[in-house]
């Protein structure tokens, strides 16, 4: 056996499939038509120019003609201009940058900027580098430092048993060092590399240099021009292996550092057009084609596509006159074939003859799961994913070859508006090149992301041949050739494979043979606002229906008017299904003609039915249809009370990859379904996909979708539940995984349940006190246990600023159509550390279908540090924020300023996740709710029985801090008592759970808090009844006014005058202390500060204060007033001690002996220093009697006391606490200095690298 296996040749052809599509046979016939002369734009995560196979084409041209990042994720603001001094400039990082003498810069000015590497590193690379840096740079040094600190602590504990004040401080110092090192290890956070960037003009072109070594020696760094000028690129280092190129915009004021955001884009490009001169068997489908790499996956958003990236990309596609676009991206859309992005794609296709190929999506196996734009946009060729037997062996190493099939996850049509959705299919897996930073040469990936470039490469071969023979083609003729020559697989349904598997050689022959004018045209098919006939809900198939269908020719952009006038087409219309009736002929000219199609689905069996009305040119019927009208009808099964609203299937046989679809009319009143799957096989475990979709108008399929990938063990059972909408058809699909070997038999049951709430959403206003909702059990006996859980509080913001401006050179559509941006600024306070989800309600959940170009928000802290960003899908972009003030900047782009101006007051919301969920009390009748008595627990409802419930308001002490009027609490209502019923109350609409939402949402609107009576206010009211003598009031007011002006005028005379008049008035001495301590010349008046502090301390009866604090309770009637007075005295005493201590410490820290001073002076200074030190020590220990050293007021004094005693561990402990309280750059620098004094250079280095990230010069660019 072993010998036979080793003798069998390796199936190289299955690694990157070309046989299945006819690409191999085409290249055998026409080896010169290998993609030469064809330019493919790859819109993806970016292509690595250093990856294997990405260097040259078969005819020696550069493989990648340009590399562009249209997202802005690699943009660096280089608007700051500087001139070198002595051949050096100071970068924005603070590093000294040495300008090499051989650089040419006639103007002598450099644009500088700064960029954190982790801002544009791919996620996988960032994680790898973080791990490596910790293991190599941090861990070895930190372990030594920690071991040394522990050793010193242990030695001191052994040698010193005494508890003197000096020993106590030393012990605290050593303990602080150990605690700090342990804390730094726990809080370790790698800032990553911080790169200084330079841009300048050498007299001929713009050049850029990135200080990739982070040491300022620019002579060892690459100098690059725009990639398109000379195909130059460099790498950030041998550890990263991340290749980058640059583009310079706006006269040097903006540098774009272009890297790949993930491995996806390079893999896609390698499939389409990779070329290996030495190993041709590894070639992509079209090795002779060139590539334009456009990065549309924004690294800031985990390579999510954005409107900005896509519209800029289409501008570049048009400007570069690309022949083909490959777009292996897409999302579910609420309405197909619409939106600004789709408009720009249509313009590139229809007006500029660019063929746009895109993935259909990976959201199958249910119907109508095609993504946008691949399966929903008329101008785009959507490609499904097919797997062949050779691929199974070569790529997946399956034990046995299975029949060819569509991948289980490949999205299926039709589109929601009736269009077929999937145009063609191609192999959906490959082992191909990936970027160098992955540290691997190739990788297996699968998805419609891989089938799209395979088809795109095949089309490139066709175009290469057409161009070589000067055969004219249009996007319409090429698409028709692909669809009319594709091979249909018998065992794969039309909605999965579309028109079939692409056949390159046959498509080429078709275009050579069919060159008529009619074949160059496109035809728009409309059925009202739809593109096909899609009858899915029960009411739509209950009776025959007539449909008006519009057919209109679409002429290529350069068509002469005379050709339009003379256009006359004689069409034969055919339908191969008896349930569809259509006219037999149509005369078409340059206008939209309408025909009537009658659909009578009454005699159709349960299940799915598809047919087409095809239009043939009677002059060349063998060329296939010129257009098709797709018609889909779904006949749903019915469940009723007699079957207990259940559907049961027993001993159902499943082959590998087999799919069984069940369309069911959901009973009116049903709210969830339960699916039970049981294996009948005792020897085979099997992988299954359970998938259910209900379609709602103008809602994406993911809004009402359930998906579960599961492994079913031998004789095992699986139970799942998901929400449903009553009265509409649902598709439930159970599919055996495509690679799951051996046959298996299973039983499965679908059971419907219904507990209906009168309100689809509960809106509760706190002022109403009691809110009612009614619940009905619609189908069966159901166990109820209603529960309202509040999970977040939502804050609504209004913009504090809105600015509109025209964008730069990258944002101009053809015919000089300038794009504009509006930037709205919002501010909010985060009351405590927690998770937030920012979103723009007006625009969120809209991407391709949005009427605005794009939306992008970035959140900044008060130092302008970027904390996170997000766009159309807010639930993907939750982030954790510490307590503090934050700014959100929201960018919205559009071609019309007037449309942007409408949004200048656009609200924005921030959802704050609650650390602990809150519950609202629910009662079964109004009187119980009114009295706050017995809460509802659980009950059983008979069918059709109605039960009211009453919800009471949330206690005021439960309202989260920071939430107030204008805010609301958000959560959900669950009704069922059973675990499955509760599980169905949460809808995981997308398989990644990104769009998880509540089936019955609850909004609890807040009102102002109750007015609180302050302590002692009653006593003050009584005191106020005793009218003061007016003269006495005037005297006191005059005194207070003089004290106020004393601090402003710095008048010692006023102080002395008041001191004589009011010798026992404590606020006077406090004001004097604060005045002296806040002066600019403070360092010259330290002794006066000490005296002023002593004066304050002497006027406080510390004995009486200590006795009061020791009291457990105060029975006196004016206890509240006494407490306020004592609290103020304690606070004043601590304040005075700290200010005195700081002054003494500053005196010692800044007193330095002068060289050559007289011996007597030196002795006097030494005695003075000892006296000051003694006084400082007394003050320190006195302070510890009254408060904790980590109290905010005491921190600076404790910090300075530690510095005086050269106890840098204690000092650093207090300094880190100061940073937590007030994270200023100066406080961080103090920490860094102490780290260096302690010898912890690794901590200092990492913290220093954090500074330019935490304190950037300005907000980052969009």
UniProtKB/Swiss-Prot annotation:
Expressed in the brain, skeletal muscle, gonadal and mesenteric white adipose tissue and brown adipose tissues. Gene3D superfamilies: 1.25.40.710, 2.60.40.3170, 6.10.250.3080, Peptidase S8/S53 domain. Disruption phenotype: Homozygous mutant mice die in utero before embryonic day 9.0. Heterozygous mice display normal food intake but appear lean with a significant reduction in body fat, smaller adipocytes, decreased plasma insulin levels and less white adipose tissue in the gonad, groin and mesenteric regions. It is found in: Cytoplasm; Nucleus. The modification Phosphoserine is found at residue 915. One of its GO terms (cellular component) is endoplasmic reticulum. It catalyses: Release of an N-terminal tripeptide from a polypeptide. Its main location: cytoplasm. Coiled coil: none annotated. One of its GO terms (biological process) is proteolysis. The modification N6-acetyllysine is found at residue 401. Belongs to the peptidase S8 family. Cytosolic tripeptidyl-peptidase that releases N-terminal tripeptides from polypeptides and is a component of the proteolytic cascade acting downstream of the 26S proteasome in the ubiquitin-proteasome pathway. It plays an important role in intracellular amino acid homeostasis. Stimulates adipogenesis. This is Tripeptidyl-peptidase 2. It comes from Mus musculus.
């Amino acid at each position: 056996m072993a010998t036979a296996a080793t003798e069998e040749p390796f199936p190289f052809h299955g690694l990157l499939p070309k046989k299945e599509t006819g690409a191999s046979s085409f290249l055998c016939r026409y080896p010169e038509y290998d993609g030469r002369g064809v330019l493919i734009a790859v819109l993806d995560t970016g292509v690595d120019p250093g990856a294997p196979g990405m260097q040259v084409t078969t005819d020696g041209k550069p493989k990648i003609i340009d590399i562009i990042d249209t997202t802005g994720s690699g943009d660096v603001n280089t608007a700051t201009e500087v001139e070198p001094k002595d051949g050096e400039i100071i970068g924005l990082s603070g590093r000294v940058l040495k300008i090499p003498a051989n650089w040419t810069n006639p103007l002598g000015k450099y644009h500088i900027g700064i960029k954190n590497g982790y801002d544009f590193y791919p996620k996988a690379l960032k994680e790898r580098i973080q791990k490596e840096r910790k293991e190599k740079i941090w861990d070895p040094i930190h372990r030594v430092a920690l071991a040394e600190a522990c050793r010193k602590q242990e030695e001191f504990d052994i040698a010193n048993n005494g508890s003197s004040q000096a020993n106590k401080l030393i012990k605290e110092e050593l303990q602080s060092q150990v605690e700090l090192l342990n804390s730094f290890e726990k809080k370790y956070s790698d800032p990553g590399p911080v790169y200084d960037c330079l841009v300048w003009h050498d007299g001929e072109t713009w050049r850029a240099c990135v200080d990739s070594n982070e040491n300022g020696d620019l002579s060892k760094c690459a100098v690059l021009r725009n990639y398109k000028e000379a195909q130059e690129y460099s790498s950030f280092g041998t550890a990263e292996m991340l290749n980058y190129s640059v583009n310079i915009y706006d006269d040097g004021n903006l540098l774009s550092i272009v890297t790949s955001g993930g491995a996806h884009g390079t893999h896609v490009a390698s499939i389409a057009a990779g070329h290996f001169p030495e190993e041709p068997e590894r070639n992509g489908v079209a090795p002779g084609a060139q590539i334009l790499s456009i990065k549309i996956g924004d690294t800031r958003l985990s390579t999510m596509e954005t409107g900005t990236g896509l519209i800029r990309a289409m501008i570049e596609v048009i400007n570069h006159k690309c022949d083909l676009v490959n777009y292996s991206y897409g999302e579910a859309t609420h309405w197909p074939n619409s939106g600004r992005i789709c408009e720009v794609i249509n313009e590139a296709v229809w007006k500029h003859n660019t063929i746009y190929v895109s993935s259909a999506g990976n959201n199958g196996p249910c119907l109508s799961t095609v993504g946008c734009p691949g399966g929903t946009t008329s101008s785009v060729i959507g490609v499904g994913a097919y797997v062949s037997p050779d691929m199974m062996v070569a790529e997946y190493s399956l034990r046995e070859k299975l029949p060819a099939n569509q991948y289980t996850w490949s999205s299926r049509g039709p589109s929601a508006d009736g269009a077929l959705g999937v145009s063609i299919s191609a192999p959906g897996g490959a082992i191909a090149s990936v970027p160098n930073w992955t540290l691997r040469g190739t990788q297996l990936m699968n998805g419609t992301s891989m089938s799209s470039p395979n088809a795109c490469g095949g089309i490139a071969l066709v175009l290469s041949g057409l161009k070589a023979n000067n055969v004219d083609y249009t996007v319409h003729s090429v698409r028709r050739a692909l669809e009319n020559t594709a091979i249909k697989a018998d065992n794969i349904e039309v909605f999965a494979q579309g028109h079939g598997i692409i056949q390159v050689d046959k498509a080429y022959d078709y275009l050579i043979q069919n060159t008529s004018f009619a074949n160059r045209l496109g035809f728009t098919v409309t059925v009202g606002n739809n593109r096909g006939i899609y009858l899915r809900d029960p009411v739509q198939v209950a009776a025959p229906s007539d449909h008006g269908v519009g057919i209109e020719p679409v002429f290529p952009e350069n068509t002469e008017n005379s050709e339009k006038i003379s256009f006359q087409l004689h069409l034969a219309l055919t339908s191969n299904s008896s349930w569809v009736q259509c006219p037999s002929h149509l005369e078409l000219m340059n206008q939209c003609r309408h025909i009537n199609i009658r659909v009578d689905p009454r005699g159709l069996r349960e299940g799915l039915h598809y047919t087409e009305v095809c239009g043939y040119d009677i002059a060349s019927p063998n060329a296939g249809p010129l257009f098709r009208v797709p018609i889909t009808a779904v006949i749903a099964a019915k469940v009723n009370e007699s079957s207990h609203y259940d559907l049961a299937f027993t001993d159902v046989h499943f082959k590998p990859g087999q799919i069984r679809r069940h369309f069911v009319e959901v009973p009116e009143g049903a709210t969830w379904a339960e699916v039970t799957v049981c294996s009948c096989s005792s020897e085979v475990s099997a992988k299954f996909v359970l998938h259910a979709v209900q379609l709602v108008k103008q809602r994406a399929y993911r809004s009402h979708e359930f998906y579960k990938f599961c492994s079913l063990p031998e004789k095992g059972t699986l139970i799942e539940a998901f929400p449903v909408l009553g009265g509409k058809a649902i598709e439930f699909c159970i599919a055996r995984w495509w690679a799951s070997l051996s046959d298996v038999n299973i039983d499965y049951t679908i059971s419907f349940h219904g507990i209906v709430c009168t309100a689809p959403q509960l809106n509760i206003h706190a002022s109403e006190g009691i809110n009612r909702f009614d619940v009905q059990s619609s189908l069966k006996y159901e166990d109820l246990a209603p529960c309202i859980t509040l999970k977040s509080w939502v804050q609504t913001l209004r913009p504090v600023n809105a600015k509109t401006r025209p964008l730069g050179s990258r944002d101009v559509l053809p015919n000089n159509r300038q794009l504009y941006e509006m930037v709205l600024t919002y501010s909010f306070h985060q009351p405590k550390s927690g998770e937030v989800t920012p979103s723009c309600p007006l625009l969120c959940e809209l991407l391709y279908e949005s009427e605005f170009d794009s939306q992008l928000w970035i959140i900044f802290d008060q130092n302008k540090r970027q904390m996170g960003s997000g766009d159309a899908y807010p639930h993907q972009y939750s982030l954790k924020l510490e307590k503090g003030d934050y700014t959100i900047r929201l960018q919205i782009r559009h071609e019309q300023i007037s449309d942007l101006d409408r949004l200048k007051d656009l609200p924005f919301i921030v959802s704050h996740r609650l650390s602990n969920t809150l519950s609202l009390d629910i009662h079964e009748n109004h009187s119980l709710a009114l009295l706050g008595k017995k809460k509802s627990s659980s009950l059983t409802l008979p069918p059709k029985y109605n039960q009211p419930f009453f919800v009471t308001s949330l206690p005021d002490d439960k309202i989260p801090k920071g939430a107030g009027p204008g805010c609301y609490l958000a959560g959900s209502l669950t009704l069922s008592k059973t675990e499955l019923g509760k599980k169905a109350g949460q809808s995981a609409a997308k398989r990644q759970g990104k769009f998880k939402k509540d089936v019955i949402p609850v909004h609890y609107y807040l009102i102002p808090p109750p007015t609180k009576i302050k302590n002692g206010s009653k006593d003050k009211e009584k005191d106020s009844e005793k009218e003061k003598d007016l003269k006495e009031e005037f005297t006191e007011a005059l005194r207070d006014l003089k004290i106020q002006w004393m601090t402003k005028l710095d008048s010692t005379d006023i102080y002395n005058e008041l001191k004589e008049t009011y010798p026992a008035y404590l606020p006077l001495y406090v004001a004097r202390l604060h005045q002296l301590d806040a002066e600019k010349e403070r360092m010259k008046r330290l002794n006066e500060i000490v005296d002023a502090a002593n004066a304050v301390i002497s006027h406080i009866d510390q004995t009486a204060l200590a006795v009061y604090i020791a009291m457990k309770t105060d029975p006196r009637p004016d206890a509240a007033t006494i407490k306020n007075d004592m609290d103020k005295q304690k606070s004043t005493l601590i304040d005075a001690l700290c200010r005195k201590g700081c002054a003494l410490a500053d005196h010692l820290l800044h007193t330095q002996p002068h060289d050559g001073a007289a011996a007597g002076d030196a002795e006097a200074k030494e005695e003075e220093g000892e006296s000051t030190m003694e006084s400082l020590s007394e003050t320190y220990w006195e302070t510890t009697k009254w408060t904790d050293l980590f109290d905010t007021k005491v921190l600076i004094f404790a910090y300075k006391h530690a510095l005086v005693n050269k106890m840098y561990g204690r000092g650093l402990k207090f300094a880190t606490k100061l940073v937590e309280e007030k994270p200023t750059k100066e406080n961080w620098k103090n920490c860094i200095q102490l780290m260096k004094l302690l010898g912890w250079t690794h901590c200092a280095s990492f913290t220093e690298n954090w500074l330019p990230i935490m304190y950037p010069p300005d907000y980052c660019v969009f």
